Amino acid sequence: MSLPHSLFLVIFGASGDLTRRKLMPALIKIHNGKRFPEHFAIIGCARTAYTDETYRAYLKEELIKSGSLTKEEMETLDDFLSTVHYQSMDPADETTYSLLNDRLKELSPQYENNGNYLFYLATPPLLYELIPKYLHDAGLLKKPGLKRIIVEKPFGYDLASAQKLNKIYAAYFKEEDIYRIDHFLGKETVQNIMVTRFGSTIYEPIWNRNYIDHVEITAVENMGIGTRGGYYDGAGALRDMVQNHLMQLLAITAMEPPAKFDKNGFRNEVIKVYQSLRPLTDEYIRDNVVRGQYIAGDDRIGYREEKNVHPDSRTDTYVAMCLYVDNWRWQGVPFYIRTGKQMPTKVTEIVIHFKPAPMQMFQMKEGLYKGEELIIRIQPDEGILQRIAMKEPGAGFYMGTMEMDFSYDQHDQETGDAYVRLLEDSLAGDPTLFTLSLIH
């Protein structure tokens, strides 16, 4: 994949939290790395009545106030902001899309753009089904030029709504031009799972039901929902974390090696894992799924007391479940998945529990040896930790465990920002790390 000569990145929801906290900081890093197309501009769209100048001033103030910019980024901030433009419009009002069309035509000669547009939907999900149609009806999807679209989660509320969205997007875009973003796939440690597996003769031969006892996938936080009550009460932990982030981690852990690591090879193997999941019948759910909700404690309010949450809400803030991948490699191996808010710690990790040796020749001073563990830490302190058996120093032959720990931070290696990687891929037209549609 290669960058086009010219491209407009059109961001709907340009005055929102996602754009301010995630997209703009990531775009500055891409700008400083000189990884934009030769002629590139960002056009922010939202209802707020900014001009180019006032929007740039707003972004500058917010980015400096965040304290996230490096010294180099502070020095190049004005140069980056010179590529940013703004069009005041209402993404929910079809009549305002003509304003966007006119603005893009006005900017096209300056940037030698012949209709290459990448649309980013950083908006509430209720607009996801409206924007593609409004873009089409306003003539913004006409040839010539490439037309791509990036959609944030959640992509639908349930199966029926996801199917409806897929039909809408398929009517206006090719599947290869639809980028359903899951920022977990942009994380360096998540991508490293595949390298650790398929690039190693140590792990891949034993990465199966014969040697692995069970797998744990955990993503928990030690804080509540904050100011997200309006969104979260309509979603919950299952929709917010399990059906996207944690299922992606499960798929990458369980997938077969692709014949070729490209957009089709990787995503097709991910789909095969989903197709192999044991069906979640009512009986299975009763026996293998736990849902919960955090309550008030000494130093915190309960979920139902959070702002914009219904006082009788039954929305889950904690989910734990046991899943099975019914195929040759994983038959009978349980995958334990859990996520929750207001937990004792904040961590996202995958733990591979290997089976102990068939005969325990050596004993531990206390308890039983349960087997080795491979821990893939996604956040915080990204890295890989291996717990292996060792002899306890001293008389006798007592077993103990030793930890071999690799951390990116300890080796002065920056893992980079997930949005940087995914935005770079979308600019270059590489959908490998984006979700492929499985439902129609």
Can you say where each PLM-predicted feature lies in the sequence?
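Secretory/organelle targeting and membrane-embedding segments
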Residues: M1-V151, F155-L438
